Amino acid sequence: MFRIFQSFAIVLFCLLSSLSLGQGVNIPSPNWGIGIGNSTRFNGLRFNFIDRNIEEINGLNLTVWYDKNFEDHTGTFKGLGIGVPVAVGTKNRYGVSAGIFAVGAGNDLAGVNIGGLAVGGGRNVAGFNVGGLAVGAGGNIRGFNLGVLAVGSGNHLTGINVGGIAVGAGGNITGLNFGGLAVGSGGNITGVNLSVLVVGSGESIRGISVSGLVVGAGETVSGINIGGLVVGAGESVNGINLSALAVGSSEIRGMSAALVVGGEEVTGFSVAPAYFRITGENGAMKGIALSAFNHIKGFQQGLAIGIVNYAFEISGIQIGLLNYVRENRKGLRLLPVFNARFD
């Protein structure tokens, strides 16, 4: 029985190879039924050695090999596709596709796609996509995407994205994103973002972001942000911001807690056991600051509690061992216990 099956497989392999350059043998019609060979337009059950110069295939397609000349990857496939070793060969692929090594399309790939090593599209990838190593697209990725190593998009990434090492996009990332080492975007990151090392964005981060080392953005960070060492942004940090070492930005709004908290304008409730700092030409603290040293090189509006408190100008109260207000007249600038503005 095994020998019969083996002989049939060899004959089928040779037949597919010989028909791969032609139109194939199709029963009962040239365009539908059961097809063997490189039929470029067909509906039904189709077996082929290499797909090339396809127009449109609908149904169940089994391909043995792939064409290394990507100019021959044309047309559209819709249905259930199985590739040994890869399910590729068309510009667009829609439906359910599985490849021992990879599943791919020159342009768009949508549906359920499982590749032993990778799933990729030259333009967009959408649906449920699992790559043994990676899921990638030159354009956008949408849906549920799992790459044991990485999920990466040249443009936007949307949905549930899990990369064993990293999740990254050249544009925006939106949804639930977990990168074993990093979640990174050249644009904005929005949603729930988890990483062992870094969550980083070239523009803004909004939502819940948790990272073992750093949560950082070139512009703004907003929401609930927890960085093992640092939470920071080039313009502003807003919301609940927690870090073991530092929270820093030009503007900080909300509740912030770290060993060091600093910025040009800090509004809200800040806890910095080691050092709280306001600096800049228009520096201001508005709210409550708790720190061993509240170093406000600007305007304090609110309450500062610490061992040492320092402010240029004040509309509020300092409580601590040593309290200094530079705008007060001599004799009232440095006081124990508390200080305020004395005209």
Each model region followed by its residue ranges:
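Bacterial N-terminal signal peptides that target proteins for export
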Residues: M1-A9
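Repetitive helical segments and hydrophobic/amphipathic motifs
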Residues: L12-L15
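N-terminal signal peptide c-region/cleavage motif recognized by signal peptidases
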Residues: S17-L19
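Surface-exposed, glycine- and small/polar-enriched segments that build interaction surfaces at terminal
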Residues: G22-D343
